[in-house]
């Protein structure tokens, strides 16, 4: 009885993030198999990202048609003009934004779909997008528009340290030791230069305390 009580007290006082991470991972003899499968999934994601960006670089180098785009340039130009400081926009600027938006959507979809397959589903859901956002530092600007419950579930779901190997490198950034893809001059930056996601595990807003309420009320 004393041992059981001590074990329960230890479990209750442990770090909740560690507890959730452990409960999502099979224990005992199944743990090596889970670790191997998870590692294979991350290696597959790394290969998919490399292939994706290699294809994007080749398409950019071969682009000759600057008039037809997947996204409407008029809409992009209208969004750009929402900034009151923007007076004039050249014809080339919306073209660059259209291509950038297209690549952004494609990569976010690729990362989200990876989470869909991890959960053995065939339909991409909003929590898959939340997973892609929380696993990739460069997407931290999206935390304010990701549904809070999905973001919390993904953080508390125990994203393992291994998941950050491939999933944490955004926009053509490759893990250390990986050969560059495409034109060497087009490989962007160093992934190690990015700090950890400051929004990870933090609430997106805080409820005002009694001292912050309007004194008139």
Swiss-Prot record:
GO terms for biological process: abscisic acid-activated signaling pathway; gibberellic acid mediated signaling pathway; long-day photoperiodism, flowering; positive regulation of photomorphogenesis; regulation of seed germination. GO terms for cellular component: nucleus. InterPro entries: Histone-fold, Histone_H2A/H2B/H3, Transcr_DNA_Rep_Reg. Its main location: nucleus. Residues 1-28 have a biased composition (Polar residues). Keywords: Activator, DNA-binding, Nucleus, Transcription, Transcription regulation. The keyword S-adenosyl-L-methionine does not apply. It holds the Pfam family Histone. Heterotrimeric transcription factor composed of three components, NF-YA, NF-YB and NF-YC. NF-YB and NF-YC must interact and dimerize for NF-YA association and DNA binding. Stimulates the transcription of various genes by recognizing and binding to a CCAAT motif in promoters. This is Nuclear transcription factor Y subunit C-3. It comes from Arabidopsis thaliana. The gene is NFYC3.
